[in-house]
Structure formats: C-alpha cells, structure tokens
Amino acid sequence: MTSHHAPTRRTVARGGLAGAAALLLGATPALTAPAAASGPAGSGPDVASGGRGIRLPAPTGPYAVGATVRHLVDPSRNDPWAPEIGVRELMVTVLRPTATGRGFPRMPQLTPGAAEVFTALAPLVRPHLPAAGADWAATLTHARTGAPPLPGRRPVLLYSPGGGDSRAMGSSLAIDLASHGWTVVTVDHPGDASEVEFPDERPGRDPIRTTVLRPDMDAGTFRTMIDTRVADLRFALDALGLDRVGLYGHSAGGTAVAQALHEDPRVAAAVNLEGYLDWADGTLLPVAREGTDRPLLLAGTDGFRDDRLDRSWWALLAHGGPVARRQLADSDHWVFTDYAALVPQLQAAGLMTAAGRAEMVGTLDPRVSVPAVRKLVRSFFARHLPAPR
C-alpha cells in the first residue's frame, strides 16, 4: 500500500425529523428487514435452494451489531429517474453496536424479493458474475435484525455505494465499522442502484425499483447521478438530525461523498474509495478544483488504471491540506465491496473464471484484502471521528 500526502433543512415525511433522529438512539421502532434464520457467528449456508450460498466475513470489533431498515421520503424533490413518482425516496439500513445479538435473527444480505431481481440483473450490471448457480438469497450478514442498540450517542458514518450497486453490497465493511463502535447508515440511491426494495407501493413505481443505468451511460447521466447522490446524502443528514458525520463511498459513491464534504459543513471527514473527482468531460468537480480543509482519504487499487482518475485526484492533492492517497496492491475496483469476499467463493465453485475474478477484485487473497480495506477505513475514522470504546 503506497501513500501520497499532499443547510438547508427539509421536511421529512414518514415520522418526522424527531422520530428519524431518535432512530439513531434506538428510541423509535423502525421498519425492519425480513427475518432470516439465525445461526452461530461466522456460519453461513453452503448450498440452499439448489444454488450455492456464499458467506460474508465476520466483523472484528468487540460489539455485536443490530440492524434496522428505514424508508425516508423527501417531498421537496422529485425523482430524476422517475418523475412520475412525485417525491424522492431513499431506503437506508442503520447499523448500531448492541450488547448482544442473541435471540435476534441474522439479517440477510438481500431479501428474497431483492435476491430474485438481483439474480437476473447480476450478469448485466457486473458481466463477470454468474447468470445461475449462486443463491443470493442464502447469504446472511452478521448484523442482527431488531437487536437493541447500546445507550447513548455515537459518531455516525454514512455509506454511498457505487453506481449499479445496492447498499447491500457494502454490508461487510459497514457491519465491521459498527462492531467497533460507530453507528453506520448505508444508503441506497434508487434509480441507479441495481435494485431497491420498498415497504409499500406508490403510484409511479413498483415495490422493487431496478437500475436505469446502461453500459453506454453518457455524460449527462453521470452528472445527474452524482448531483442526485449528493442531494440524497444531504437529505439523509436532515432526516436523521445529524450535524457532524463521516461519509465513505465506493466509485460513484466516492465521488458523491467527496463533493458532499465540500458542500456541507456537517461532514467532518470522508473516504473516497476509487471515485472520479471530475465530470465525464474532464471538468473538475468543485472539491478537486478548490480543495478542502477537512480530512479526505482517496483510496484506490493498482488494478484500476485510469488516467482520468489520476488526473482528478492529483488536482485535489495539489492543493495540499488534510488529503491523503492510498493504494492497494494486487487488487481491483470492487475490492472495497462485499465482492472482495464473494467473488473468490464464486470462482472456487466454478461459477466465475480467474480472469473475471481478477477484473473485479484482483488476485489478492480475501484473507488479506478484506482486513486491509477494513483497517484502512477504520483507522481513518478512528483518527478523525473516533468511536467510544
């Protein structure tokens, strides 16, 4: 790993600002994810429903982790991908340290409905993934649905996934951070996420929305995606009553969190996991053009070689300030996600090729890459937004 150094408040539907903020303290019941069968820590199914179940690595912190799912609605914005809906909706998962997860079911990575949709979408959004043979509904996370949080306030981190990915594909890192004492909120961005499941129907949309992104995404679509994500993150801060947070995001999510750091003083620090800092035409984002006086980590891989990424990152680094760059060796773009652990299992099962694995996550053993990514992100926030122990 190498190193280079160099609001406006909106109305919140569905429960109101006070209720949403209380969610972070565990004082208000929230919409919970469908239950999954419980099992011992570190266990997971090998084969289920005729397909191969794949396991996520256990968290490393001293706390068990509880999970709740929340539906947030911003009536002040329309959805840019589906204007007929009339509002902008988000789905988020709130992960918090808990004294014990005993007696509470493990949260599935994907609900049965989302897994069914993702099975069809997987080889389209990520061409190296198998079209059959993987039972995406069988994978359990290490968070416990409905487990009560520890009392008191804790620093909050928000996660924005990459374009074409759902928040579910960032579960492992988020749960690990929560096990070390942070409250972590993973955010779906409906319209560009692979699939987002809602608790109800609404005129203009089905219970599960799928991605509008296509391989030939143009410059205008990329700009809409980033602008919408930044607005989503800022709305989530409004909705949850937060005033000093950390953000981290992968790919397009990394782009969004870096720009949100620039725009919103409530963001104390951010981690950009291999996201561009310019628009598709090469015009620098304001954060890269003007620099930042708040901590920002730029983390990349040696497998994702891209002149555009390097140019936009170096433009920001040239300003100096509390910005650092790190690089993971023998890795590629999706090593920062759950795919770091899942893809090698799919390859071992004969469902992916070695070349497909290398193009997605690199050749590094997940027993090395997963701890490396966790330590990288955790140590950054431990310095700039430490969690109580």
Q: Where do the language-model regions lie?
A:
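Primarily recognizes the serine-hydrolase "nucleophile elbow" in alpha/beta-hydrolase
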Residues: 238-285
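Alpha/beta-hydrolase-fold serine-hydrolase catalytic core, especially in secreted/extracellular enzymes
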Residues: 45-47, 52, 57, 330-333, ...
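Domain-level recognition of soluble alpha/beta enzyme cores
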Residues: 44-157, 358-366, 382
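N-terminal secretory signal peptides and thylakoid transit peptides that target proteins
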Residues: 2-20
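C-terminal region of N-terminal signal peptides and the immediate post-cleavage residues
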Residues: 26-52
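Short substrate-entry loop that stabilizes the transition state in hydrolases
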Residues: 147-154, 159, 163-196, 305-306
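Alpha/beta-hydrolase active-site loop
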Residues: 202-240
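The feature captures the conserved acid-bearing segment of alpha/beta-hydrolase catalytic domains
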Residues: 269-333
